[in-house]
Amino acid sequence: MREVLLKELSNSDIDWMLTTGTKEEIAAGKVLIRQGEPVTALYILLDGELLVSLSQPDNNPLGRAFAALEGGEMSGREIARLSSGDMVGEIPFLDTYLPSTTVKALTKSVVLAIPQQQLAKKLKEDISFAAHLYRASAILLSDRVEQIVNQLGHSTLVLSQPKLREILFIFAELRDSDIDWLVVAGTVSKISTGTVLIQGGRPVEALHILLEGKLTLSASEDDRNPLARAFSSLEGGESPEREFARLSRGDIVGESPFIEAPPPSFSVKAVEDSWVLSIPQWRLAAKLLHDLPFAARFYRVLAVLLADKQRAIVSSLGYGRLSYSKDQSLDESQQYENELSSDFLAQVALAGARFDWMLKRIRRS
């Protein structure tokens, strides 16, 4: 993924990073980011190789079961190797996030470390920089999640549903004007029970927001290559699929074209009569290209949801769990991943109000 940053960042973005950041040499074997501990900087790997791994689960039965199922070991499982051009820091521009993986130098490496405080300030003040970095982050995180699934096995797809309710985050982050544009640019359509909205392995042509009803996500059990699966429908055959999640109102599907991800490996189907708002891929792509403030908000949403998806897999398998359970003693100095802050509760109210406003706007049009 070394070309992502060069492709997505501008010359002024790179100049600012070089001026603000500090080059650091990392000895082979040294831990750069430790799972569950705060990150103070964004790291760009300039030279060398980094290893991304999961710490050993604390006797979690689900983690043991999946490790056995996929034929792997539980201790310090390798999930990715990063080369020059990759970026790590687990979205350091979100101060409530703790790393879900450990990153250490596999060989002697050189990184550019950009302090979190300066980065957060830059993201607020420079919309163009924010749009570029959030998009690059989303692309890299999408690739990282794909690597995790490939390393741990496709059985982990069932665990990859974000812990953040998408409706709560998406509609809290977007502006009223953004939502108004989505309504105007999109088309509301009814998806009858049993209708496939997105076929796994096939190109995605629109971003879909579920307004009413329920959709299922199903993974194909066909082990043929993606091209063979994509054209199998021409032969009139259907490959067996296994449902692993259900979507409800406010959830989105179809974001893969905007982060240069391959066509999704799962299919999306209506399990009851449903209504969706569909924004054509070409219209949204044009909007993202010409409206930088909107692009910054949109790609930030995708980056956070992808990071949360990665955390969902790791946490569900029991790797470095930092969530609070009933009857557990609370450590006031510890941050728990399922702890509800006052800011989060305020976001919930705001997101709900905006989603209801969007529904009313659609009904009037």
What function would you assign to each model-found segment?
Residues 1-365:
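Cytosolic regulatory regions built on CNB/CRP/Popeye-like sensor folds
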